[in-house]
Structures are given as C-alpha cells and as structure tokens.
C-alpha cells in the first residue's frame, strides 16, 4: 500500500537554520490548522547551539 500523492491537508516541510541556511530537520504540518510559517528554536549541529529554524520547502 503506497501513499496517495494528492493535495492533502498534511504536508512535509523542512526546517532551515536562519544562521547557516542548512536544512537540518524535516517535519509535517497540517495546512488547515496552521496557515503561517513554522518557526522553532532547534539545535544546529554546525554551530553547536540552539538557533531559530524556519519552515522551508523540500526540494
């Protein structure tokens, strides 16, 4: 059983570090519940500290 490739409410997004620009994390987001872009404080392994990560598209 494969996943459907339609336009569902849940989408896969990447979290991009604001200081380095590297995509460190991937997560899912429900578009019906959250319309604005996701912003989280996450650990950046390059800088070895917690930085702001914003939602970006997965290539």
UniProtKB/Swiss-Prot annotation:
One annotated GO molecular function: structural constituent of ribosome
Signal peptide segment: none
Record keywords, A-Z: Ribonucleoprotein, Ribosomal protein
Gene3D superfamilies: Ribosomal protein L33
This protein's record includes keyword Ribonucleoprotein: yes
Record-level GO cellular component terms: cytoplasm; ribonucleoprotein complex; ribosome
Any single Pfam family the record assigns to this protein: Ribosomal_L33
GO biological process terms on file: translation
Entry-linked SUPFAM superfamilies: Zn-binding ribosomal proteins (SSF57829)
InterPro entries referenced in this protein's UniProt entry, alphabetically: Ribosomal_bL33, Ribosomal_bL33_CS, Ribosomal_bL33_sf, Ribosomal_zn-bd
HAMAP family from the UniProt entry: Ribosomal_bL33
Family note: Belongs to the bacterial ribosomal protein bL33 family.
Annotated protein name in UniProt: Large ribosomal subunit protein bL33
Organism for this UniProt entry: Borrelia turicatae (strain 91E135)
Lineage: Bacteria, Pseudomonadati, Spirochaetota, Spirochaetia, Spirochaetales
